[in-house]
Amino acid sequence: TVARNAAGEDPSDSLVLDGSIGLDLQWVKVDGKLLASSDYLREAESLTIFNLPDQCVVSTEVFIKPHLNTTMMGLYRSRTMYCTQCEAEGFRDITYYLDRPDVMAEFTTTVVGDLQQYPILLSNGNPIDRGIIDGDRHFVTWHDPFKKPAYLFALVAGTLSVVNDSFVTSSGREVHLQIFVEEKDLDKCDHAMLSLKRSMRWDEEVYGREYDLDIFMIVAVDDFNMGAMENKGLNIFNTSAVLVNSKTSTDAAFQRVEAIVAHEYFHNWSGNRVTCRDWFQLSLKEGFTVFRDSQFSSDMNSPTVKRIEDVNILRTHQFAEDGGPMAHSVQPESYMEINNFYTVTIYEKGAEVVGMYHTLLGGENFRKGSDLYFDRHDGQAATVEDFVVAMEDASNRDLSQFRRWYKQSGTPVLTVTSSFDKQAATYTLNFKQYCPDTPGQTGKLPFVIPVRLGLVGAEGEDLVLNSEGHTQVIFEVTEVEQSLVIDNIAVEPVPSLLRGLSAPVKLDYQYSDEQLAHLMAYDTDGFNRWDAAQTLSLTTLQQLAEDSFEGLELTLNGNLIDAFARLLKDESLDPAMVALMLQLPGEALMHQLADTIHPAAIHDARNFVRVALAGALKDNLLDIYNRFNTPIDYRPEADQIGRRSLKNAALGYLMLVGDTGAELAWLQYQQADNMTDKAAALSALVNSPAAADYATQALKTFEQQYRDEALVMNLWLQIQAINSQSGGLSRVEALMEHSAFTMNNPNKVRSLIGGFCSANLVNFHSADGAGYRFLCDQILSLNKTNPQVAARLVTPLTRWKEFAEPHSQLMRSELQKIADEPGLVKDIYEIATKSL
């Protein structure tokens, strides 16, 4: 049923419905009357119906061919089932409709299928009717009482097994929980179900949000472009985001499942009950929900470790996006293809912006603001401005300047200098902010930057910063230049700045090596302790990369060795923290920070430091490995995960010196009773020139053991794809012929091709340009079958201007080839042309 919007200014009596070229229109009816072909106009992407009354019922019938749909948008086939993906604009590939997020309707869906072939028929909401048709067919009717836009529609039909459970809400309602999987995967659902129940309870306790339907369903799909989709009451998940057990999944996979299950469940309120008015408001639901799932993961595990993981993603990927040709604001003003704006800026930077509300307003006011937002806009398609106003009204604070975080693109740089006046016993911090120009934006205005900070004394103590006795404060930088004077400081301290990365900015403070080592040893903020280790390592790596490019002999500064030695001996630290502090900054981050990128020099410098540290600290590393390499019943919980991560970090270093590491890794591979340890050992062997025989044997036995486990074989592909030894491209091309790989499965494409091009940088960026030509060929191949996956693969080529020759022109040449391809879809065209 459609009705004219009385507020609309267009006097036309025509209705334009979104559609696609794949819809085979059979008929159109208005109020039950069959229309003549002259009463409507069908075009490639729309259906216009003429001369409609102000209110009427419009009916259409279309034929579609989902079994031929390789884009995995709309309705398509995956192995034994049919399923859907409608966000952002997939519903128009199923039927004609007003396919935009502000058009919300109550859906009743009847699914009909062969009883033997498709015994499971699912859609949104609650089942209200079912029955048999002609003996061999059946139907199920689903009703979703909550109005929703078409992007939240879902349908599944297939032969599936189910894991059942239940949850009692805070008001006493019992909700039926179901996870549908292929029968062979029934033993991999327990963790997802536990994560779902924890998420439901947490959202009640922390945000006051109770589930609203009688049933909540998750379906695991092997062929899926995304991680998961929050369709109302019927979440559809990539198998990699829901299926885990200790024999087939790593600790990281367990944590990923927990986070994604939570994220999609939290969308029931921040995305479904309150959706977004248009796709320019995408971060309204995604940034808020990423922040919520990060809070949840922090509460379930280690808050410090979770924050470090989030910041690593932000600095490596989002800061790079901010500094490249695809830079855009959290609330972009235009796009060519909406699928290209499901980005780290919208999601991760959007979450950082929400986190700054929490920091600036405090937890209590933030909760008041979120409650007000949900209460005001329940059942509506809202805007970013609605969210900001709710926070303003709840906290009685003017957030006018804060809104710049939504409109201005780029990563602000916060430069800090300090001075100490011993006679006056004052310590002064001077702050200066600026934001570099980005495509289409110059002359940025000052942001509101909350700087959480402390001062660490000469003996490692936290110094008092104000008359209230606080040892940590939040200083708001709102001007281009500002200063903070702290009294009663007798001895010059070391500043601990931007604790927890309290704002998504780049910090420029000229720490000495000694100051960084001091923070590594004494800072009571765990994040900044790790960050000091990263900064100390990064300073060393950047200098060595420069030396390597200049052809100079490489030598390692003793300060880094000493700092790492102290770290390995500090038994007071959480093992997970030590493991993270042992990880050197990655090559991708070094690429992002370099003025001109020399891939081989960066790789050689990082490898040199790893080898030098391993040689100098071999005994300490061996002690760590032996201490944590003890038999224990597997649990995917924070304490055990930390122990395994530290043990395997030590093993990675030990592989670089002598034969000890190779023998330990081979023994660990053979004896491991969990996939975390087995995969870590396999990766260590594969990346070691000294362990070639062991690696060959391990890869062979791994394949034999797990050849029927698709997700495990994806890991097998990925480990080989990111092997940084020479010959990487040849190995990848050979693996593309392996039975474990197919271009038709996005997970496999991401594991092998994506892994090679994004995480094996020294091989991808070979000076002959073979890696670039290879990637171009794969993108153009996928252009014909799955443009959304293809578009994601373009990213490694987009920053060609920052590379030294011959890389720069070789990358540009392949980008130009992509842009010139006849029949190129707009997903890829937009990224390629903007990058050129």
Locate each region found by the language model.
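Hydrophobic alpha-helical and helix-loop surface patches within well-folded domains
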Residues: 31-33, 89, 142, 171-423, ...
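Long hydrophobic segments that form regular secondary structure
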Residues: 341-375, 408-445, 500-526, 531-542, ...
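Short, hydrophobic/aromatic-enriched beta-strand segments in well-ordered soluble domains
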Residues: 1-4, 19, 52-69, 107-115, ...
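Extended, low-hydrophobicity, Ser/Thr/Pro/Gly-biased non-transmembrane segments
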Residues: 61-164, 525-530
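Surface-exposed beta-strand/loop patches in extracellular or lumenal glycoproteins
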Residues: 3-23, 96-99, 105-114, 385, ...
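Long, ordered, helix-rich scaffold segments
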Residues: 316, 487-836
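A surface-exposed beta-strand-loop module
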Residues: 12-14, 20-78, 134, 477-493
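Beta-strand-rich binding/interaction modules
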Residues: 21-30, 398-401, 411-497, 542, ...
